[in-house]
UniProtKB/Swiss-Prot annotation:
Residues 70-138, 143-201 bind DNA. It holds the Pfam family HMG_box. The lineage of its organism: Viruses, Varidnaviria, Bamfordvirae, Nucleocytoviricota, Megaviricetes. The keyword DNA-binding applies. Keywords: DNA-binding, Host nucleus, Repeat. SMART domains: HMG. GO terms for cellular component: host cell nucleus. Belongs to the IIV-6 401R family. This is High mobility group protein homolog 068R.
Length: 201
């Protein structure tokens, strides 16, 4: 099997396993897996050491960029568990992990659609974040000569925008970067030239 095909297979395996690990339903069924167990399993799977070992021993791949990519987005139910788990554990100190998850499932089902909406909003924002990070990673993996001046500008400007507007959604952050890029081309030609020359290297 060619090295490129092996890497694609590894990426697909990572995607499948992470999707399976995080497959906690938002519907009426009580999730069966414990959130802390899911988090620990995911952490172990995503670790660079584990990824490198699996890449070498299973696929015979050596080199860089073997990690499974950006942190996956959470479901609405995951955000709910993250928000409520500590309180449930405090109120039920003798309960085992699977019992805590059962209680969380019951609490989730008791919520009205309006009460659940905040968690669905968090999940939607987190999905935007994941897709944005995934696109950034995809572009970073290309050769430097293929990176556009606009992308290089966004890499520098995005952290600044997020710091200035911590509650801004990923979509709006991207829009703000685009706005600043257009303003820079008009108001700061020296800076614009810097990114054009950087992209040309």
């Amino acid at each position: 099997m060619a090295a490129k095909s092996k890497k694609i297979l590894l990426q697909n395996l990572n995607s499948f396993v992470l999707d399976s690990i995080l497959a906690i339903k938002d519907g009426e069924e009580t999730p069966q897996s414990d959130a802390s167990l899911v988090a620990n399993l995911r952490k172990q799977w995503e670790s660079s050491e584990f990824q490198k070992k699996m890449a070498v021993e299973v696929f015979g791949i050596k080199g860089k960029n073997l990690t499974p990519g950006p942190k996956r987005n959470k479901s609405a139910y995951m955000f709910f568990c993250q928000d409520m788990r500590q309180n449930i554990v405090a109120d039920n100190p003798d309960c085992k992990p699977h019992q805590i998850m059962s209680l969380l499932g019951c609490k989730w089902r008791e919520l009205t659609t309006k009460q659940k909406s905040q968690y669905y909003k968090q999940a939607a924002d987190d999905k935007e974040r994941y897709l944005d990070d995934k696109e950034l990673e995809k572009r970073r993996n290309k050769t430097p000569s293929k990176l556009s001046s606009y992308f290089l500008f966004c890499e520098d400007e995005r952290p600044i925008v997020k710091k200035e507007f911590p509650n801004m959604s990923t979509k709006k952050v991207t829009a703000e970067c685009g706005k600043r890029w257009n303003e820079m081309k008009i108001n700061d030609p020296k800076k614009y030239k810097y990114y054009v020359e950087k992209a040309a290297k």
